[in-house]
Amino acid sequence: MAPRKRARTSSTGGASSSDTSVTTIKLSGGESCPSGVVELWRSGQLTDTVVTVEGRSFAAVKFMLASGSDYFRCHFNNEQMAVGAANPTLQGPVSAAAFEALHSFLYEGECSFDETRLTEVLQAANYLQVKPLERAAVAALKERLSPSNALAAWTLADQLSGTPDLAEEPLPEELAEAAKETALKCFDELDLVEHATLKQVQALVADDRLTAKSEEAVFSAVARFAEAKQPAEAELLGLLRNVRFVQMSPSFLHDTVRSWPMLDTRAGQGLLFEMVAPRVS
C-alpha cells in the first residue's frame, strides 16, 4: 500500500502583525438587569457581601452572584460554609481583572476588557461556572486562533475540561478541537512546539489533515519536541511511528535521521529499519 501523503503548505504564508497596541474586547450574550439595578450596583448601594480577589475587594449582592454563577449558588447555599460564606475570598484561576469583567457581565450581560485578559476571563468564567460568559469567551478565542497561540489554547482547553457540564455543550472540548485544527493547518508555523504535550504532538502527527511543507519538517518538529521533553523511549518510538520516513529524501535520512542521538539505540534503529523497509522492498 502506498504511504499516505500529507497536505503541503503553499509558498506564501499569512502576514504577521507587529502591532502591539492594546485592544479592548467586548463579550456579550448574558442577560442585562434593569438600569436601576445596575445603577444601585455601580453606586455600591444595598450590597450584602464582599468578594476578595488578589487583595482587591468587590462589593456585591449575593442574589446576583448566585443567580448568575453556579459556583456562588453552591457557595452561599452550603450551610457548612455559612460562617465563611458571607464574604468569600476567591483563589485558584481567578484574577482580580477577570473577576471585575465577570462581575460586570452578571449585571449588564456584557463586559469590556483588555484583549490580553481573554484567557483569564475564560478561566474565571469556567471556574465560577458562568456559562454564557464562558461561551462568549470561547467564541472570541476561536476567532483569534493563530500559529502563535494554537498550542497554548489547546492546553488551556484541556485544563478547563476538568470541569465538565453535562447539561451544556462541552465548550472546552470545542475550543480544543478548533485549536487542533489550527495547528494542523499551520504546523510549520507553530510557536514553541517543544512546549506542547506528548498527547498533542501525537494527535497532530498521526492526523492525515496535517499540513506541512515536507516530512522532513515534521521530523524536525518532533525532534525539537523530543529533545526538550525527553519522553520515555517507548513513548518516543510510538510518536515516531506516525512520521512518514519513506517520504523523506535519502540524504536527510542518512545525514539527519540516522545520526540523531535519540534514535541511536537498538530499538530506535529497529524502528527506523522497519519504517523505511517499504522504500527498498
Predicted regions mapped to residue ranges:
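Hydrophobic, mid-to-C-terminal alpha-helical segments
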Residues: 217-229, 235
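Charge-dense polyanion-binding interfaces
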Residues: 81-98, 156-160, 243
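Alpha-helical oligomerization interface recognition
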Residues: 44, 48-85, 99-104, 132-139, ...
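Signature of small Cys/His-rich zinc-finger-like modules used by ubiquitin/SUMO E3 ligases
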Residues: 7, 161, 182, 186, ...
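Eukaryote-biased feature marking scaffold/signaling PDZ-domain proteins and nuclear chromatin regulators
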Residues: 44-46, 53-55, 60, 67, ...
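Acidic, low-complexity intrinsically disordered termini and linkers
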Residues: 5, 234-281
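Post-BTB helical module
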Residues: 101-203, 210, 231, 235-239
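N-terminal BTB/POZ boundary and linker segment
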Residues: 2-63, 97, 101-116
